[in-house]
From Swiss-Prot:
GO terms for biological process: translation. This is Small ribosomal subunit protein uS12. The modification 3-methylthioaspartic acid is found at residue 89. Part of the 30S ribosomal subunit. Contacts proteins S8 and S17. May interact with IF1 in the 30S initiation complex. It holds the Pfam family Ribosom_S12_S23. It comes from Chlorobium phaeovibrioides (strain DSM 265 / 1930). One of its GO terms (cellular component) is small ribosomal subunit.
């Protein structure tokens, strides 16, 4: 416990908060170029082939980003937009690729939560067929 005199001399130091997505540098999103697109397996209780991409950002930092949704058109040298948000069962993956932006296509035939996957509104005639 400091004395009053020590507090007058030095004051209290403010603890700096640690960010969950440091590569974004306090920006909501950042643009980058895919250097490698591949699949990886999740941590212990889960089993799948998760689609991820290694992305070199505009600030020269290289990160691993998750590709959400079913199917994608990404390959090496694709320009992508990344946002924060980790994938709980993939260690080291702290970013998501934004679907429907830049070179990334939206998810095809997506009917629910479309805005999160960059999918356009389905045509009225097709919606009746899907409903049954």
């Amino acid at each position: 416990m400091p004395t009053i005199q020590q507090l007058i001399r030095h004051g209290r130091s403010v603890k700096a908060s640690k960010t969950a997505s440091p590569a974004l540098e306090k920006c909501p999103q950042k643009r980058g170029v895919c250097t490698r697109v591949y699949t990886t397996t999740p941590k212990k209780p889960n089993s799948a082939l998760r689609k991820v991409a290694r992305v070199r950002l505009s600030n020269k930092i290289e990160v691993t980003a998750y590709i959400p949704g079913e199917g994608h058109n990404l390959q090496e040298h694709s320009i992508v937009l990344i946002r924060g948000g980790r994938v709980k069962d993939l260690p080291g993956v702290r970013y998501h690729i934004v679907r429907g932006s830049l070179d990334t296509s939206g998810v095809a035939d997506r009917r629910q939560s479309r805005s999160k996957y960059g999918a356009k509104q389905p045509k009225e005639g097709g919606a009746a067929k899907g409903k049954k």
